[in-house]
Design a protein with these regions (language model features):
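Glycine-rich phosphate-binding loops of nucleotide-dependent enzymes
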Residues: 1-196
Length: 196
């Protein structure tokens, strides 16, 4: 079913979740509590006629804080009071805890410590192994090599063919970032059917 014209709520109902690159403003509202920020992407605490079950919301937020080792004063803490790394752990944890069918995650470990990065990687792999589709967008090639089954590169507005992770090297990805794949924008003769 095409989702291009579907609203955010419809996409969420179908199991699509997203971790944006911009933490404050897109991933969390800076002036709202962590509990209230749950409502940006999670609807479990909503009741009939739009009522919010505040206790359920606090419990949900507390669970994310605990499971992802987020250092915060509690679910009532405002988002802007967290360090960048702790806010990242909270946003990623919020989306992972939704058990999405499809997760698009940009820069999943940006600003987090090594231990938290390992936990996030393990959770992303666990979600994938449970049958979800996980699309990771990252500038960290080592992170992509660790998480991906296959890689794509976007260069000059064009999407590369899939590259199995086992065949990926820093050098090859570097070439592809310049559009140098068979049929890529850096090889116009290949697009026309000439030798690559």
């Amino acid at each position: 079913e095409p989702i291009g014209r579907m609203g955010a709520a419809g996409r969420r109902r179908r199991g699509l979740h997203f971790v944006p690159e911009e933490r404050l403003g897109r991933g969390a509202v800076p002036s709202l509590s962590l509990a209230t920020n749950m409502l940006l992407t999670r609807q479990e605490a909503l009741r009939a006629f739009g009522w919010i079950d505040r206790a359920a919301l606090r419990d949900q937020a507390s669970g994310v804080l605990r499971r992802y080792w987020v250092k915060a004063a509690g679910p009532g803490a405002v988002a802007r009071s967290l360090s960048g790394g702790n806010l990242q752990k909270y946003i990623v944890g919020r989306e992972l805890d939704a058990v999405p069918k499809v997760l698009v995650v940009a820069q999943p470990t940006w600003g987090v410590d090594v231990g938290a990065a390992a936990q996030i990687h393990a959770e992303l792999l666990r979600l994938r192994d449970a049958g979800a589709a996980v699309l990771v967008v990252s500038e960290e090639l080592e992170e992509l090599f660790a998480l991906a089954d296959r890689l794509h590169v976007i260069a000059k507005g064009r999407l590369s063919p899939p590259l199995p992770a086992a065949d990926a090297t820093v050098e090859r990805i570097g070439e592809w970032m310049s559009g140098l794949w068979a049929g890529g924008p850096g090889r116009p003769e290949a697009v026309a059917g000439g030798p690559a």
